Amino acid sequence: IPLPKVNVKIVNPKDGQEQKYDEVGEVCFHAPNIMSGYFKNPKETDNIIKTHADNKKWIHTGDLGSVDQEGFLTFHGRIKKIYLTKGSDNNVYKLFPMQIENELIKNEEVLECGTIVVPDQEKIHVAIAFVRVKVGLEKETVRGKILEFARAHLPEHAIPKKIMLIEKMPYTQSNKIDYKKLEEKYQKENR
């Protein structure tokens, strides 16, 4: 963060311990001019402003991130958008929809990507990627290419169970992908 006297660290959301380089956790920051709290809402204030072992008050942003050895912060999504899933080895893994989107958008055929997470028949969370691709591409061929790309660039547990091609990505009034509409579309087409 390019501001003087602003400190940033990544902590484990479960125990508050500082993460090592390149480990994903909650982004927290401390500065001499942080807010004192939410107006008439001490409960929410206590959820976001916490005193750490250094006796400083830190803002817990609710964002997931990691810091590399050069000090660069990478944003990974929101804490509320973390799901648990099982890999083929039966181990439990964290599933980050934004990680999937960030990788799939690198594919040259992909114009936009929105990822939702749904339970499958075994009640395990799986990713469903909605993808808008360049006009004129053959659907099954491009779907296969995107899946192949996902297998090459994502951990096994994060590979979308299904790639759904979409002609127009739905957006909210604040110009963000409308994940509720994607969930509704998925439910409607998979009854």
Give the ranges of each region predicted by the language model.
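AMP-binding/adenylate-forming catalytic domain of the ANL superfamily
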Residues: 122, 152-177
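Conserved AMP-binding/adenylate-forming
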Residues: 1-72, 79-82, 101
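Phosphopantetheine-dependent thiolation modules in NRPS/PKS and related acyl-activating systems
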Residues: 176-191
